[in-house]
């Protein structure tokens, strides 16, 4: 008695499991938005930041997310005071008087 087996082998690859990677958060576009000596209008954003890397000086407000913004129209001034980076806005009228 003769037995004949017809065995066919096919290419096979077991499906891989799902991965938990493959996503990233959108950038928050933080940083300095206006440079030293630049003319700004009241309400312009000067610095977007997390925490207080820059501190508000004269005529600069701080938002709930630590964003610094101009309270008056004038010129931006960055300076170091007691080891802190401070951002101020010098009103346009004062700059005209100085020149």
Swiss-Prot record:
Molecular function via GO = structural constituent of ribosome
Q: Which GO terms describe its biological process?
A: translation
Positions annotated as pro-peptide in this chain are 1-10
Gene3D superfamilies named among the record's database cross-references? 2.40.50.100
Keyword terms, alphabetized: Ribonucleoprotein, Ribosomal protein
Q: For this UniProt entry, what's an example GO CC term? A: cytosolic large ribosomal subunit
What superkingdom does the record give?
A: Bacteria
- UniProt PTM comment: The N-terminus is cleaved by ribosomal processing cysteine protease Prp.
Q: Which family does it belong to?
A: Belongs to the bacterial ribosomal protein bL27 family.
Q: What's the protein here called? A: Large ribosomal subunit protein bL27
Question: Which species does the entry assign this protein to?
Answer: Caldicellulosiruptor bescii (strain ATCC BAA-1888 / DSM 6725 / KCTC 15123 / Z-1320)
In the UniProt record, the gene name given for this protein reads rpmA
